[in-house]
């Protein structure tokens, strides 16, 4: 008996795989739907077309799910932001109120202090004026005019000379 070579069965199986008695004009599932019967269609082709369409649908579903998750995340961020907007405004208003109140009190104290200083200065000048007036009425020379013995120039002489 003749022993077949080991490469011959492989060659026969390769030829059998290459030779397809089925129709290959089918490119999509829509082409399959147009056929009356699936008897002449290669089951591997049907499986491949179904897998391709399933992959397309899965990728579309994943994209839709990602968009939905992204929109939900944006809504959650906006809601989280809304939770902090009102307290932030309240904090800003309260802090500005307290700052302005403190600043007003500080200005008021500074004003009062300056007013007391000026009042003391006015009192000192008033006393000096009163003493000068009293000295003038009593006939004495005022204490202010230490070098006042010289007569001042008349104003019209300054224009002429």
Swiss-Prot record:
Residues 1-22 form a transit peptide. Residues 108-161 are mitochondrial intermembrane. One of its GO terms (cellular component) is mitochondrial inner membrane. The chain crosses the membrane at residues 85-107. Residues 109-138 form a coiled coil. Residues 23-84 are mitochondrial matrix. It is a single-pass membrane protein. It comes from the Eukaryota. The keyword Lyase does not apply. It is found in: Mitochondrion inner membrane. Keywords: Chaperone, Coiled coil, Membrane, Mitochondrion, Mitochondrion inner membrane, Transit peptide, Transmembrane, Transmembrane helix. Component of the INA complex (INAC) that promotes the biogenesis of mitochondrial F(1)F(0)-ATP synthase. INAC facilitates the assembly of the peripheral stalk and promotes the assembly of the catalytic F(1)-domain with the membrane-embedded F(0)-domain. Component of the inner membrane assembly (INA) complex, composed of INA17 and INA22. Interacts with a subset of F(1)F(0)-ATP synthase subunits of the F(1)-domain and the peripheral stalk. Belongs to the INA17 family. This is Inner membrane assembly complex subunit 17. The gene is INA17.
């Amino acid at each position: 008996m003749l022993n077949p070579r080991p490469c011959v069965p492989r060659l026969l199986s390769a030829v059998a795989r290459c030779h397809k008695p089925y129709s290959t004009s089918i490119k999509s599932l829509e082409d399959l739907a147009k056929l009356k019967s699936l008897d002449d269609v290669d089951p591997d082709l049907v499986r491949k077309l179904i897998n391709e369409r399933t992959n397309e649908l899965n990728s579309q579903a994943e994209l839709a799910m990602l968009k939905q998750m992204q929109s939900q995340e944006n809504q959650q961020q906006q809601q989280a932001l809304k939770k902090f907007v009102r307290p932030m405004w309240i904090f800003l208003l309260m802090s500005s109120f307290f700052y302005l109140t403190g600043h007003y009190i500080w200005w008021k104290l500074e004003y009062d202090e300056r007013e007391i200083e000026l009042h003391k200065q006015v009192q000192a000048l008033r006393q000096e004026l009163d003493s000068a007036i009293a000295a003038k009425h009593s006939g004495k020379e005022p204490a202010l005019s230490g070098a006042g013995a010289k007569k001042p120039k008349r104003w019209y002489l300054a224009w002429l000379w």
